[in-house]
Amino acid sequence: MKQLMMIGFGAMASEVYAHLPQDLELKWIVVPERSVESVKQKVDRHIQVISDINQCDGAPDYVIEVAGQAAVKEHAKNVLAHGWNIGLISVGTLADSEFFTELQQTAEQNGAHLHLLAGAIAGIDGIAAAKEGGLEKVTYKGCKSPNSWRGSYAEQLIDLDQVHTVTMFYRGTAREAAQKFPANANVAATIALAGVGMDNTIVELTVDPDTTQNKHTIVAEGRFGQMTIEMVGVPLASNPKTSTLAALSVIRACRNSVEAIQI
């Protein structure tokens, strides 16, 4: 049976843990030192809960990150240096161009692969394919409820308690969006890296006081033609800032790591 390492154990990780493929064994969970004991109480005894990659006593077949940008900065390079493949959900971390280059070089030098998971959006395969044939323009539009934007940079741009209609409060590049909205803009970073890049992808962020769902729209143009992809998703009940589909994309990546036929 193949073995999995999971970095993080918050709301999304708990969802993934509950729905892992039967033929993939979760062997290691990596969390901050302060959280080790509490996480141990939530998982099976055979799972090793550690705070440092170097404490791992084996070699995972696959590593997934579901912990946020700080955890990517702390652990991803070390994972790749061990020659282990890793799937990232916190793709916004790669808005840091120097860090992106470090990870790319480390992966190449150690024969490892860095997988950027689609997360909360559909159509990443189409964007990546269009890039091969002349993708020229990509705009990402994200719309969420006021509660989904609370605790983010949005509160510095708009009074979320005084929003009475659909309101766009941010327009900029994917690089800037990923840096300013680390918990909300991983989708923008994924779209950008699949397509025309961090500095050429336009991001528009909107708040809707009458919704409880997350709406993602991609509009792309190029020599291939035009495409519009719209996704209306439901947040996790345990965390309104996290898309259910994002958690499911991690589960799908785990399944792909063990299946002979991958989609």
Curated annotation (Swiss-Prot):
Keywords from the UniProt entry: NAD, NADP, Oxidoreductase, Pyridine nucleotide biosynthesis
Pathway: Cofactor biosynthesis; NAD(+) biosynthesis; iminoaspartate from L-aspartate (dehydrogenase route): step 1/1
Catalyses which reaction(s): L-aspartate + NADP(+) + H2O = oxaloacetate + NH4(+) + NADPH + H(+); L-aspartate + NAD(+) + H2O = oxaloacetate + NH4(+) + NADH + H(+)
Oxidoreductase as UniProt keyword: yes
GO molecular function, one term: NAD binding
EC class (word): oxidoreductase
Keyword NADP: yes
Residues the entry annotates as binding NAD(+): 120, 186
Pfam family, one: NAD_binding_3
Protein family membership: Belongs to the L-aspartate dehydrogenase family.
Name of this chain's protein: L-aspartate dehydrogenase
Organism: Acinetobacter baylyi (strain ATCC 33305 / BD413 / ADP1)
Lineage of the species this protein comes from: Bacteria, Pseudomonadati, Pseudomonadota, Gammaproteobacteria, Moraxellales
Gene: nadX
